[in-house]
Amino acid sequence: MSKVTVVGAGNVGATCANVLAFNEVADEVVMLDVKEGVSEGKAMDMMQTAQLLGFDTKVVGCTNDYEKTANSDVVVITSGIPRKPGMTREELIGVNAGIVKSVAQNILKYSPNAILVVISNPMDTMTYLSLKSLGLPKNRIIGMGGALDSSRFKYFLSQALGCNANEVEGMVIGGHGDTTMIPLARLATYKGIPVSKLLSAEKLQEVVASTMVGGATLTKLLGTSAWYAPGAAGAFVVESIIHNQGKMVPCSVYLEGEYGESDLCIGVPVILGKNGIEKIVELELTAEEKELFAKSAAAVHKTNEALKEVGAL
């Protein structure tokens, strides 16, 4: 019996749970929320689509009842307030740090062997907070950001090329933020052909720029954070772990010398499997890419310092 818990039944959490159920990633999906009735109602709504969509995953909703999350294999943490228009990810720290820390501690009381997938923002910092405050091995704490950013990168590449997004390969590393992510245009391909041979340098730079502000663009349009792609990205990471797929996915993970950086969680390609992070993949970066990664890491370090300022670490 495989079991996944999603903490936070808001837009992102509910989307993640729905994708997990529809794709039958686990036998049971539990949604937990602090607001009375929300997760129960959404779980019931999802279960009433089972005969329409043809899945048999059991979806359970509960209000702050962590006992119902017991023995989860993977737990997705989406808790926290969403980013409002004009709000920086850094401004979220004061509120979300306390929420994420409390959630993670409660989860581990009932699922001490769970692998944690963090979606809460600022994601790199919340992943780092979880790792530092819980004392778990680093393979069991994973930030989702790179999976989402890479999907957005592939979307914008496919739009520029006029092709199916599933035929494009592209990767984003670095921090999960508008100014810290690094879309690796040099390595992007369409059916094995370097995209740089198909798009002008100017057009490729437009794609990179659109990717970097992808989240902010949606926030302006929606008036709140996006949820379909973030929820699906979380489910994608969970499926890679639960089904031991060995996929290479960019995720925010704890570095200890890899890419010349230490004591932070930041987006790099990893192999995901039943143990969570099976391996960190070190790419051969150009001098320019190395410089961008170092700047991104410095920005993430600076954001992490706020954890001490608010007393979270």
From Swiss-Prot:
Enzyme Commission number, as recorded: 1.1.1.37
SUPFAM superfamilies: LDH C-terminal domain-like, NAD(P)-binding Rossmann-fold domains
Signal peptide (UniProt feature, chain positions): none
Annotated binding of NAD(+), by residue: 8-13, 33, 96, 119-121
Keyword annotations from UniProtKB, A to Z: NAD, Oxidoreductase, Tricarboxylic acid cycle
Matching HAMAP family: Malate_dehydrog_3
Protein name, as recorded: Malate dehydrogenase
Lineage: Bacteria, Pseudomonadati, Bacteroidota, Bacteroidia, Bacteroidales
Gene of this entry: mdh
